[in-house]
Amino acid sequence: MNKEQMTSLILAELEKNPEITNEGLADILSVDIAVIKERIVSLSDVREKILIVDDEVDALTALKVALESDGYNVIEALDGFEGISKAKSETPDVILLDIMMPGMDGFEVCRRLKSDPQLSSIPVIMLTAKGEVDDKVEGLEMGADDYVTKPFNLKELKARIKSVIRRNVI
């Protein structure tokens, strides 16, 4: 059972019995109580969610800390395959996507995200050292909503994140 199905079942049970305990939900749904607790916490987290897909751990960690300090819920993925998987399971509000990664590069990740009906509406900001005009054009033509080159100004990146989230809500 995936997270969305689990969430739907939990909400259905809570609608039937608002006083039910986590233990009661775990018994009814035949799952470990830790799974119930994780889904309940997830349901109550209303912060905007950002998925960062980057194989450079130091850069990812620094950016994660900076965005979390602004109140974002930040999820991380270290390669393209994990990025697609987390996009499906976590449904972020925006994805920050590096291009140069092993296994599957960011262009291919973006193409797959934008061709998946479940994920195509999630804004993607390419965040990469590839700053040539042809790279920018390719990223934007793949469906990226914005393109920021490394090194970047954190204040500008935060403004761009707010902008794509705002455009996506309207």
Where are these regions (language model features)?
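Alpha4 helix (beta4-alpha4-beta5 surface) of REC/receiver domains from two-component response regulators
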Residues: 5-8, 108, 131-148
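Conserved acidic segment of CheY-like receiver
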Residues: 47-58, 63-67
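Helix N-cap/capping motif at the beta->alpha junctions
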Residues: 76-85, 106
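Short amphipathic alpha-helix used as the core "switch/output" element in two-component signaling
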Residues: 85, 107-120
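Receiver (REC) domain active-site loop signature in two-component systems and cognate sites
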Residues: 101
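C-terminal output helix
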Residues: 152-162
